[in-house]
């Protein structure tokens, strides 16, 4: 692993998104609906649904909202969303990978294109930056919730089938092969760990510092993409701030 750490960035993004919680719930409902529709409504038999429900809970999504999305899928709704990705560069040459769930591809493509062009970025062709990212399972343990030291956590992670452990003052960050993600997550929970975050994500192989004079524009681009109702995830290769 390149040493790229996500946890502080995730915390910062979640804090910044408090004012957008309604939109976040809308996006999570869409993910839950599609996961339940494609893999069944029982999270015990549908790892994707379970992962999305865990993600919803970590964002304090009300239980009733989760149940409604699942019932909508059970009820045979004809509503359908396509999974689409977009790739490009932010100001300063930082690679950006966008995942969307949409019922109108033209609308989403237009929204994404406008976000890039109005904020100093450039939308690229399919495959232009995807190769710069690796799909990984990502799990976080808040150090304040466990008495285990780094050696013990590393042992448990390796026993569970995890690939890598990174530590900071406040968290243990675990990376897994995507196919092993659910097994590693379940094993760590069984070992008694409380997980602060658990998701499938995209990790940049290398990172690019955002130039000081491009930082505001870069942040505006990410915000514009995340403001789109259809965009589910925005991944960048921006270097962590010191």
Curated annotation (Swiss-Prot):
Keywords: Cytoplasm, DNA-binding, Transcription, Transcription regulation. Belongs to the TACO1 family. HAMAP family: Transcrip_reg_TACO1. The keyword tRNA processing does not apply. Its main location: cytoplasm. Gene3D superfamilies: 1.10.10.200, 3.30.70.980. InterPro entries: Integrase-like_N, TACO1_YebC-like_2nd/3rd_dom, TACO1_YebC_N, Transcrip_reg_TACO1-like, Transcrip_reg_TACO1-like_dom3, YebC-like. One of its GO terms (molecular function) is DNA binding. One of its GO terms (biological process) is regulation of DNA-templated transcription. One of its GO terms (cellular component) is cytosol. Residues 1-22 are annotated as: Disordered. It is found in: Cytoplasm. The keyword Disulfide bond does not apply. Pfam families: TACO1_YebC_N, Transcrip_reg. This is Probable transcriptional regulatory protein lhv_0777. It comes from Lactobacillus helveticus (strain DPC 4571).
